[in-house]
Design a protein with these regions (language model features):
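Sec-dependent N-terminal signal peptides
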Residues: 2-11
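The canonical Cys-X-X-Cys-His
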Residues: 46-49, 109
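A domain-start/cap signature at the N-terminus of enzymes
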Residues: 11-21
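C-terminal alpha-helix
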Residues: 136-140
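Short active-site neighborhood of thiol/selenol oxidoreductases, capturing the structured segment around
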Residues: 32-46
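Thioredoxin-like thiol-disulfide oxidoreductase module
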Residues: 60-125, 129-132
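Typically the conserved alpha-helix immediately C-terminal to a functionally engaged Cys/Sec
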Residues: 49-65
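A short beta-strand-turn-helix
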Residues: 19-36, 66
Length: 142
């Protein structure tokens, strides 16, 4: 049984989940020659963040595209006690915000190449559906 669980975990594509560790995301992006999509979010208090997740990131077409092309990295800053981050994770998110979101915009989504060059920034909820969001990324891929 343990072998099956390990095999299943190893076979999961890296972009099928939102990572929370920048170093891990960077390593995966380098190894697979993929872009990194960083999303700064307030998952339990930021209305536009919640809306963007529902209308873009939770949609099947976005997930299918991301699975093949992106490493997803979420820097969440929840406020409710029940969603409180570990001290270590909060420190990682704050360090990431200092570099990529110094103004504290929510939501803020960035597309980076495998060498960490910022290719595109979406400040706030851009009001795109998942198909439109994917099309914007595809234009950058060309």
């Amino acid at each position: 049984m343990n072998f099956l669980a390990i095999f299943w975990f190893l076979m999961m594509p890296p972009s099928d989940i939102w990572l929370s560790d920048f170093l891990k995301a960077r390593t995966i992006a380098k190894e697979n020659h993929q872009m990194i999509l960083i999303n700064f979010s307030g998952s339990d208090w930021c209305g536009p963040c919640i809306q963007m997740h529902k209308e873009v990131f939770e949609k099947d077409d976005f997930k299918a595209f991301a699975k093949k092309n992106l490493v997803l990295l979420k820097a969440d800053f929840p406020r409710l006690e029940k969603n409180k981050l570990s001290t270590q994770q909060l420190k990682k998110n704050n360090e990431l915000a200092l570099k990529y979101n110094p103004d504290g915009d929510f939501p803020l989504t960035l597309l980076l190449d495998e060498n960490l060059k910022v290719l595109k920034v979406w400040s706030g909820n851009p009001g795109l559906n998942s198909d439109e969001f994917v099309k914007e990324i595809k234009l950058i891929l060309k």
